[in-house]
Amino acid sequence: MIKKELPDEFGHFGPYGGMFVADTLVHALKQLEHAYTKYRNDQDFLSELHTELKDYVGRPNPLYHAVHLSKKIGGAQIYLKREDLNHTGAHKINNTIGQALLAKRMGKTRVIAETGAGQHGVATATVAAKFGFQCVVYMGSEDIKRQSSNVYRMKLLGAEVVPVTSGSKTLKDALNEALRDWVSHVDDTFYIIGTVAGPHPYPQMVRDFQAIIGVEARAQHMEKTGHLPDALVACVGGGSNAIGLFYPFLNDQSVMIYGVEAGGKGIETGEHSASLIAGKPGVLHGNRTYLLCDEYGQVKDTHSVSAGLDYPGVGPEHAYLKDTGRVIYKAINDSEAMDAFRLLTHTEGIIPALESSHAVAYAIQLAKTMSKEQSIIVNLSGRGDKDMHTVAAIDGITI
């Protein structure tokens, strides 16, 4: 049985989580924790959040029965939770709206963010434009190359995009730079972290804002079928879209839950981003979790065809769920994700993000082992517009 009251008062999920940061950030984090504790059950705050999610984001989004995909595969019925239909094209806005409302109540005038695929950067720039914040987004220079359309969207929205050229020039390096910025500007700046990683209270706060995914999906599946789904599947980078779907189902023991990491070119090659499957516990970005690191504890470079899964750590609640066995974590490699991307596009006319394609790929494998009376909810965490250049390049086409 999962304890719903996690994390504890110190931000721990079992041995994971916590607040491993420089002394200069402890006060800012305590201030944030105090504000979140105050507002998370405040009716005015929750009412404003609900209104923004409904009128601005477009929630609730549908739970779509992928009839043609299910028929093509044979086996379980596949339902897609359509986070791709949100304003800005992914689940990220569920969280940035919540944190922006918190920043407003805390009197902050500037927001910063890190981004990998660019979706969190776009979602942060979007809420900054809406609420009148100055906005700076840190993004690895490698990811800037992969996600040029999202970079342009951020700039259109009025954000400054800062290229990060250190390390692997991807998400972990962008996160490092954002933390450095925050240390220097704690008084006027709110750091909008995009995933369920980072120091306490971020893993809890982001989970709570993303849990709307699972709350809606649970009610929608009950309405459509009269029962709970047999399985849930979501991709896991930092893990916010996954925990958002999983959290409201954790105590439903009849529901199998699968998190899908980026297997890259194959786990055996070392070129992947599967920290839960191939990593070990350590400390990164302010929390204890599973990491991809060498024998000296140095964080390894990672690889995935999808920029949003290209991260060497994972949210601490996922680490806890792995150890307890409540969630089973699998890896899908680049080519399997690409195959699923094409199959969903051709059968349903839905172009998924490459991140989400990892979840679709595992759901296809899983569905084949199940009966036609059973069902799987897949979190379609984002749409694939941002990935057109990557997919075209794989196909040998320049656009």
UniProtKB/Swiss-Prot annotation:
Its cofactor is pyridoxal 5'-phosphate. Signal peptide: none annotated. One of its GO terms (cellular component) is cytoplasm. Pathway: Amino-acid biosynthesis; L-tryptophan biosynthesis; L-tryptophan from chorismate: step 5/5. The modification N6-(pyridoxal phosphate)lysine is found at K92. Keywords: Amino-acid biosynthesis, Aromatic amino acid biosynthesis, Lyase, Pyridoxal phosphate, Tryptophan biosynthesis. It catalyses: (1S,2R)-1-C-(indol-3-yl)glycerol 3-phosphate + L-serine = D-glyceraldehyde 3-phosphate + L-tryptophan + H2O. InterPro entries: Trp_synth_b_CS (IPR006653), Trp_synth_beta (IPR006654), Trp_synth_beta/beta-like (IPR023026), TrpB-like_PALP (IPR001926), TrpB-like_PALP_sf (IPR036052). GO terms for molecular function: tryptophan synthase activity. Its EC number is 4.2.1.20. Pfam families: PALP (PF00291). Tetramer of two alpha and two beta chains. Belongs to the TrpB family. The beta subunit is responsible for the synthesis of L-tryptophan from indole and L-serine. This is Tryptophan synthase beta chain.
